[in-house]
Amino acid sequence: MIRFIGFYDYTVILTYISLISSVYGITQAIHQDYKTAIFCLAFSGFCDAFDGRIARTKKNRTEDEKNFGIQLDSLCDVVCFGIFPALICYLLGVRGFPGLLLVFFYCTCAVCRLAYFNVLEGNRQQTEGGCNKGYRGLPVTSIAFILPMVFLFQFFMSELAFLSLLHLVLLVVGFLFILDFPLPKPGLKTILSLMGVLAVSVGIILIYTKYRLPPHTDRTSHIVEEVEELFEDIYETETP
């Protein structure tokens, strides 16, 4: 009988879907399809908001299943809400030495927060169990709500102002990831309200970009061309 490592039941399916959505979004961001990338980021945030609730519906979960869920969620969050949004900001123009420092800072803060959360959650599960009632610092999932809101501003402000805003978002949000302050966990009504606002925002982005794509979103075309030329050079070098 063939056996696989890991768990693949309904308690972790949303986490896997969230990861797939973000990986697909990364490919679309590289090809400058930012509206699809933002949609994928928002969808990953939606999945992350409900994966824990779904997992807790299974009453007979083993300790291995619980611990696997905690580790899997954080590892996927590194991609979905750490690397993915930082890449979007980079491709939108957060570059140069200051921009790269902010990208590194944001990713490091996200990873640090998730690792620290795993330690705290593992200890809490052993002593208390059940659902966590609050957060310490800003959850990384919040970027799935913040970045689509920020993305809307590019349609109504200058390129310089928009890029400055992206720099500020990476700095402030990254800092809030690691700042130790109590934050109540939102209830179901609050989550649904935020999802509604997010859905409207993504809808506006999809409709607006269908009729008008801001000129400064073309600024990354040369990046794609340089990457393609690099692979062509490598192929030609290795081909006898």
Give the location of each predicted region.
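Multi-pass membrane catalytic core of lipid/isoprenoid biosynthesis enzymes
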Residues: 11-16, 57-113
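Lipid-exposed faces of alpha-helical membrane segments in multi-pass integral membrane proteins
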Residues: 14-20, 40-43, 79-82, 104-108, ...
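Helix-coil boundary and interhelical linker segments in multi-pass alpha-helical membrane proteins
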Residues: 24-39, 79, 83-104, 149-165, ...
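Topogenic membrane-insertion module of multi-pass membrane proteins
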Residues: 1-52, 174-215, 231-235
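C-terminal membrane-associated helical module and adjoining short loops/tails
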Residues: 127-240
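C-terminal ends of transmembrane helices
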Residues: 56-61, 111-126, 175-185
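Short, amphipathic, aromatic/basic-enriched membrane-interface segments that mark the entry/exit
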Residues: 3-13, 67-75, 131-136, 160-164, ...
